[in-house]
Amino acid sequence: MRVIFTCGGTAGHVNPALALAGLMRQRDPQTAVLFVGTPDGMERELVAKAGYDYAAVEVDSFRRSMRPEAMRHNLHAAGALARSGPAAKAILREFRPDLVVGTGGYASFPMVKAAVQIGRAHV
């Protein structure tokens, strides 16, 4: 089985995915696992420490403010969100997962949405 876990933002999103990946590998050592998160999110370090492969999709949070710096940030976030869809689909085409598991955080949105769009099993 080939599984993508997508998560990020906090250890509360990442650690359940790591636990599930470990369980799946324990039951079937041939399970291929890929984690997908953001380029510089804390999830990258946690996944590396656990020994799993990692791919990144640029996505950012939106700020709920009308201040100029928040507006600039949101413009950047909107651009990243627009680019994240094609990047997520490219990862899906290359890895060819049987299942995509999203455990939360804004980093999981592009991968789960792409899985839905191309008809991949997802949770």
Predicted features by range, described:
Residues 41-45, 100-117:
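An aromatic- and histidine-rich active-site surface loop
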Residues 3-10, 30-83:
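Conserved nucleotide-sugar phosphate-binding/catalytic loop shared by glycosyltransferases and other
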Residues 92, 96-101:
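Proline-aspartate-enriched helix->loop->beta-strand connector
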Residues 13-24:
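Short amphipathic alpha-helix
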Residues 20, 84-88:
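Generic hydrophobic alpha-helical segments
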Residues 25-30, 117-119:
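Short helix-capping segments at alpha-helix termini
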Residues 121-123:
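Conserved small/polar residues in nucleotide/adenosyl-binding loops
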